[in-house]
Amino acid sequence: MTLLSSHLLVFSAVHHRAPPTTTTRNSPTTNHTVRFLCSPGVPPAVRLDQRLPRFVVPGAGAEDLLYNAGATVGVLGGGYALVRAFDELTRRNILQQGLSRKLVHILSGLLFLVSWPIFSNSPKARYFAAFVPLVNCLRLLVNGLSLASDEGLIKSVTREGDPLELLRGPLYYVLILILSALVFWRESPIGVISLAMMCAGDGIADIIGRRYGSMKIPYNEHKSLAGSMSMLVFGFLVSIGMLYYYSVLGHVQLDWASTLPRVAFISFVATLVESLPITKVVDDNISVPLATMAVAFFTFHH
């Protein structure tokens, strides 16, 4: 047999392999994603898109490492610029400190969520993304423990200007960002919805509640009906918007007919949890995203 005929036989064998067997249950694929298949007769709310994402970036080797490192630096720079911009607006009395702090709360997490598709398709990309809030976590620890003093950071993310505040709500906030990136990443709607409810839902609830919150919730005098309603509405809308964003980029495929009511239910539960008089025991930056994750996991996997 000649060398040419040997190559032709090998080529023929490769292109006539038997097709892979059909996945019959939730199982990991070779590209480290999971197919969400539903029980017979039950329409799926979400399927991972097995097509090549429309946003194609490097996936392996030194090029992938450099690409993700560059993306990390870019996202870090964007987050730093955001905080500094609001600090400057506050310093010039263009924005009140309380409003500036809440806008940072809303925008920093959402911009981090929007940045995920910038990273490569490598399974290791999530670790590069998680490095961004990890750096902010270290900044909060250093300043919260008074090992250093960044007045701009303290004014931008604390209520009273006390560095110890950095070790509570803001620290919990960045820890949830890290958790969502590492555990859920782009393969699941759970992390997307959780961050949308924590950042947009809870953040807008505070802004609206302080301005129009004269009518309080009967079981919690510190929370208002206007704030809770705004959290429900904006949390739902931002969650749907983010899911649509990831759907357009090809990371997930959604059955919108079943996804919309499920996200509405998740938003309702998250709003209910946020309205409970438990803030002194559990911070909203912990209770809201963790409750959202639990309900979303149950909703999208059943």
From Swiss-Prot:
Q: Which reaction(s) does its UniProt entry say it catalyses?
A: phytol + CTP = phytyl phosphate + CDP + H(+)
**Can you list the GO cellular component terms from the UniProt entry?**
chloroplast; chloroplast membrane
Superkingdom of this protein's organism: Eukaryota
What's one GO MF term for it? phytol kinase activity
User: Where is this chain primarily localised?
Assistant: plastid
Q: Where is the transit peptide?
A: 1-57
Q: How does it sit in the membrane?
A: Multi-pass membrane protein
The subcellular location is: Plastid, Chloroplast membrane
Return the broad EC class: transferase
Pathway listed: Cofactor biosynthesis; tocopherol biosynthesis
* One GO BP: vitamin E biosynthetic process
Q: Known EC number(s)?
A: 2.7.1.182
Q: Does the keyword Transport belong to this entry?
A: no
Keywords attached to this Swiss-Prot or TrEMBL record, sorted alphabetically, are: Chloroplast, Kinase, Membrane, Plastid, Transferase, Transit peptide, Transmembrane, Transmembrane helix
What is the stated purpose of this protein?
Involved in the activation and reutilization of phytol from chlorophyll degradation in plant metabolism, including tocopherol biosynthesis. Catalyzes the conversion of phytol to phytol monophosphate (PMP).
Output the PANTHER family linked to this UniProt entry.
DOLICHOL KINASE, PHYTOL KINASE 1, CHLOROPLASTIC
Task: Give the record's family classification.
Answer: Belongs to the polyprenol kinase family.
Q: What is this protein called?
A: Probable phytol kinase 1, chloroplastic
From which lineage does this chain's organism come?
Answer: Eukaryota, Viridiplantae, Streptophyta, Embryophyta, Tracheophyta
